[in-house]
Amino acid sequence: MKVILAKQAGFCFGVKRATQMAFEAADKGGKTYTLGPIIHSPQVVQKLEEMGVKALKDISGMDDGTIIIRSHGVASGELEEAVRKELEIVDATCPFVKKAQEHVESLSQAGYDVVVVGDADHPEVQGIVSYASGKVYVVGSGDEAAKLPKMAKIGVVAQTTQSFENLKNVVDACLTKGGEIRVFHTICDATAVRQEEAKELASQVDCMIVIGGYNSANTKRLAEVCTELQPRTYHIEMAQQLNPRWFEGVGKVGVTAGASTPKWLIDEVLEQIEKINKDKNH
């Protein structure tokens, strides 16, 4: 059985940067917390907890210490509160997310109604939305955008993990809604590259394994993209979840991982697949 690992599997630039910053802060010791999970990888969050860094839902109970801002960013009000409390802030917000926040802020100040393409329940989107001082709408698809009211000036940004296709569909729908539209391409290339590569790989193999947190939006999207081309696609968080039955009659296995999946988790999965393959051949 041949195992092919996607070249772009695992940490993207923003996640790598955020985890490095978090582990460096943890090494310094002292009271250190992250505001929400640093990235959407329960295993990385657990490692940080073992080093004494706990994830907080909010900073209302914090009076001193270091607060690490998660890679997805946080609401502007929470950042202001951290500054007011004079906490030491380690801002690990992904620069691409930061860009989307800044666009929303400036569009809003310039009198545009803002449309954010994304998942309203996702912390990244909730953070981006908080930078709007005027009207702001969150839509998940072109169909949802078609239900928006008429607006004079529309500014569009996207959650960084959205597909380019979805952004285009929303923009098409917005063209019928306003006289002036400004669109900022805030989708991260790492997401698009991973999806394209995963599609290509899924079409060449008999079974596809996608590794990453069940709470990771980009990993879930990878699994969806792969399933369309290879129904035998399995989304797992760690090696122990691999089932030998999945590999029955399989000649080629494709493996990819979300942008918040650490290399050590990918390595463990590859080792376990190798072990299953050996047992199968005995």
Curated annotation (Swiss-Prot):
User: So which domain of life are we looking at?
Assistant: Bacteria
List this protein's GO terms for biological process.
Answer: dimethylallyl diphosphate biosynthetic process; isopentenyl diphosphate biosynthetic process, methylerythritol 4-phosphate pathway; terpenoid biosynthetic process
Q: Which Gene3D superfamilies match?
A: 3.40.50.11270, 4-hydroxy-3-methylbut-2-enyl diphosphate reductase, catalytic domain
| Keywords attached to this entry | 4Fe-4S, Iron, Iron-sulfur, Isoprene biosynthesis, Metal-binding, Oxidoreductase
Keyword Phosphoprotein recorded = no
Cofactor(s) for this protein? Answer: [4Fe-4S] cluster
- A molecular-function term among this protein's GO annotations: 4-hydroxy-3-methylbut-2-enyl diphosphate reductase activity
Known EC number: 1.17.7.4
List of residues binding (2E)-4-hydroxy-3-methylbut-2-enyl diphosphate: 40, 72, 122, 160, 216, 218, 260
Which residues take part in binding isopentenyl diphosphate? Answer: 40, 72, 122, 216, 218, 260
Pathway in which the depicted protein is active: Isoprenoid biosynthesis; dimethylallyl diphosphate biosynthesis; dimethylallyl diphosphate from (2E)-4-hydroxy-3-methylbutenyl diphosphate: step 1/1; Isoprenoid biosynthesis; isopentenyl diphosphate biosynthesis via DXP pathway; isopentenyl diphosphate from 1-deoxy-D-xylulose 5-phosphate: step 6/6
Catalytic residues at 124
Please give the catalytic activity noted in the UniProt record.
isopentenyl diphosphate + 2 oxidized [2Fe-2S]-[ferredoxin] + H2O = (2E)-4-hydroxy-3-methylbut-2-enyl diphosphate + 2 reduced [2Fe-2S]-[ferredoxin] + 2 H(+); dimethylallyl diphosphate + 2 oxidized [2Fe-2S]-[ferredoxin] + H2O = (2E)-4-hydroxy-3-methylbut-2-enyl diphosphate + 2 reduced [2Fe-2S]-[ferredoxin] + 2 H(+)
Q: Which amino acid positions bind dimethylallyl diphosphate, per UniProt?
A: 40, 72, 122, 216, 218, 260
- Answer whether the UniProt record assigns the keyword Oxidoreductase to this protein: yes
Give the similarity note: Belongs to the IspH family.
The protein's matches in NCBIfam families, at most eight in alphabetical order, are given as: ispH_lytB, PRK01045.1-1
- The protein in question is named 4-hydroxy-3-methylbut-2-enyl diphosphate reductase
